[in-house]
Amino acid sequence: LSGGEARQTTTQFDDEASLPVTMTLPDDDAERIGTANNAQTAETATQYYTALLSSRLGKLFECQRLSVYWETGGNHVTIGKTSKEHALLLSAGAYNAASRRAEDMLTVDDGWIERKNPDAIVKVVPDSVLGGGVFLTESAQSIRHALLTRKALGGTGAIRKERVYLLSESLLQTPATRLAAAVYLASSMYPDLFGDVDATEAARQLIDEAGLPSAGTFFYP
């Protein structure tokens, strides 16, 4: 893993560096997940970052995990507990604010969101806004600004702390890209746990592993 703080800025890929044959888990993480010293390596990025997330997020108490309102590409449409997005949130160390809603009642309003008072908001955007081949973020900035200034949500923890994240719909395509999304979100929501994790590089490796183009902007901010 590259050093440096968890990325909170525009995420772009513009090279084709290859994935190392093996990746070595930090000693603390290897010890936490019960990996022997002579077997601290992972042969794929998926194995590596799955283990890393499990180790780091395992340090959280339940009361420290954030509640997230996930908004799909449709405005005010959220996700149920049987969805892949729900599983993604769990793997990122968060709770789905809509987990108790019936699968046929996933269209909500600002009043419901305000009452749930989420700690963070995730908005899925088309791959024309964020995705492979996208390097300009004006559209993403505009969408995020609209969420941050949505009047009814001003009192929520997500807006007060500006925990509003935009995610490319292309990251929902495969297990590897959903893991990339989880790394982005976990690094953004829990920066103290992921200060040494380069989320940009992690996502590049995972997107490459999925066989998809990794040059572009997939997460904002």
Regions found by a protein language model. Name each.
Residues 1-221:
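N-terminal ligand-binding lobe of clamshell/alpha-beta domains
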